[in-house]
A protein has these predicted regions:
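Glycine-rich FAD pyrophosphate-binding loop
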Residues: 1-18
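Short His-Asn-centered micro-motif
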Residues: 2-4, 32-33, 171, 188-190, ...
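Central helical "cap/lid" subdomain
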Residues: 9, 20-25, 189-215
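A conserved beta-strand/loop capping segment in the N-terminal third of enzymes
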Residues: 13-23, 30-86, 150-155
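A short acidic, glycine-rich active-site loop
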Residues: 24-28, 166-167
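PAPS/PAP-binding and catalytic site of the sulfotransferase fold
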Residues: 37-41, 176-180, 209
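Active-site/ligand-binding neighborhood in enzyme catalytic cores
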Residues: 56-61, 70-205
């Protein structure tokens, strides 16, 4: 196993900060609906039952994500799927009408695309700012194809994932990685491409997990 970083685990690597396992490269939640997979990883290290339920803050008001009935209640005060669906359809129709008034039939940018999929309110409060920060450009300057669809759940469920099993290894991902690699020859701080010929000669098959366009 070769890693050009000075530690095991790649993007799963955790740092211990005052006894807290901090995901150095962003939060990672393990999730699967396959019981065999779940049983396998739990045979290596015990997982907790963490449920990812994000919350967005827009001008001091909190909204549950992903978009579900809790979100729609917080947004509009609606309490039934029928009310939420009617509100979304109403705003989608308004977005399409604005486009037609401009003489266009298809979304010209991400803003128009998002509003025809989910309506103005959710777009303005929960999509626009995040997207513009992520891309460093205004949504009106981004192509429509970036957003193909926006999942909407007409149930009161804040669970981000649909998978049956999810969690984080107790003790952090480092424990999982170290046990998976127990007995394996590892080289850290080693650039695969700087020693490619030598390393490829050591194995019948290479599994590359870096940036695909580097290989």
């Amino acid at each position: 196993m070769v890693d050009r970083r000075p530690h095991l685990g790649g993007n799963l690597y955790c740092e211990d900060v005052e006894g807290i396992h901090v995901h150095k490269y962003g939060a990672h939640i393990f999730h699967t609906s396959d019981k065999k997979v779940w049983d396998f990883v739990n045979s290596i290290v015990e997982f907790n039952r963490y449920t990812n339920s994000p919350v967005a803050n827009y001008k001091g008001k909190l909204y549950n994500l992903p978009f579900n009935m809790n979100t729609f209640y917080q947004m509009w005060g609606v309490t039934t799927p029928a009310e939420a669906k009617a509100k979304i359809e109403e705003q989608k129709a308004e977005a399409i009408a604005r486009m037609k008034a401009d003489g266009v039939s298809e979304p010209r940018n991400l803003e128009e695309q998002a509003q025809t999929l989910i309506g103005k309110d959710i777009y303005e409060k929960l999509i626009k700012g995040y997207t513009e920060k992520q891309w460093g450009r205004k949504c009106t300057e981004l192509p429509a194809f970036i957003i193909k669809r926006l999942p909407v759940r007409l149930v009161f469920d804040n669970n981000y994932f649909n998978d049956k099993y999810q969690g984080i290894p107790i003790g952090g991902y480092n424990v999982l990685i170290e046990r998976l690699l127990d007995g394996a020859d590892t080289r850290l701080g080693c650039d695969f491409f700087a020693h490619r010929e030598e390393l490829e000669a050591l194995a019948d098959k290479v599994v590359f997990t870096g940036a695909i366009d580097e290989y």
